[in-house]
Amino acid sequence: MPNASRRVLVLTGPTSSGKTSVACAVSQVSDDLVIINADSKQVYRELPILTSQASCGMLYGYLSVFDEFIPSVASWMRDCADCLESVWAQKGIPLIVGGTPMYLYSLLHGINLLPSLPDCLMRELSEELDNLGPSGFLNRFVCKSGEDLSRFSCDSYKMLRDVAYFLYTGKTIQELYRESSVYKIPYDSIDVVAIIPSDRDSLYSKINERFLEAVNSGAIDEVASVVENKAAFRNRAVTTICGFREIASYLRDEITLERMVAMGQRSIRNYAKRQLTWFRNKFNGIKAFDQPQDAERYILREILL
């Protein structure tokens, strides 16, 4: 790799495309490579099987599902910046690996810095959302505030965030974004390599196989240990992990094992579709490969040498 004290290498692609295997392979060839996680679901230490966490690297499993703190793009950017500074200080090569589109988009283009929300406000609103449900929660807020319903997300996690910001600042999330400053990690250069399989059927087959393997390897026990501790579990972001809600429904005897597997697989396939749409529409100029072995070969021969 050419001399660059603050250079970044990124390896991305949809779920089950082979990113982790490529990252592990190239890190074995180059002792200087340090893997940094860029997957928003692989940060929870209680769910390594369900989220297919890598066995090595930074920012994997470093948070707990029982923490009141809910990670965001901004918090990942701060943590990633700290990791990068640490790797650069040791003359290492950071390899950021993951498929969370907003993490990668913010890494490339920067992020709007929004004010931090008080934990007490988030706890209060989260309890209201639990008691009223998404529709009742939003309708109650709209009735009290007189705000336009269409200005708030229908997704429960984003809805909670949007309402919290409005109550705390008196402004909508859109207004805050327009008024905020942009933070960008100060690297010298960045190389982005993506694995974008053209054979969707093959990708979906791998997704199905991986979720089934996770179910058979302990993912059910992982989710059970989380949902059984209802008093401590308040992190809504965890419930958005593909397969989590389906397994939780199975544990409540609401669906059969076979139905749970099918629903979990479908959830992950739909997520992969959204990832592919992001890569197609938002990430111009990246070096994309159809097969993981081609991406590995390019990294080893064109970037690391």
UniProtKB/Swiss-Prot annotation:
EC nos: 2.5.1.75
Annotated Gene3D superfamilies: P-loop containing nucleotide triphosphate hydrolases
Pfam families: IPPT
Annotated residues for binding of substrate: T15, S16, S17, G18, K19, T20
Site (Interaction with substrate tRNA): T100
GO biological process: tRNA modification
Catalytic activity: adenosine(37) in tRNA + dimethylallyl diphosphate = N(6)-dimethylallyladenosine(37) in tRNA + diphosphate
Record text on subunit structure and interactions: Monomer.
Protein name from the UniProt record: tRNA dimethylallyltransferase
Organism: Neorickettsia sennetsu (strain ATCC VR-367 / Miyayama)
Encoding gene (name): miaA
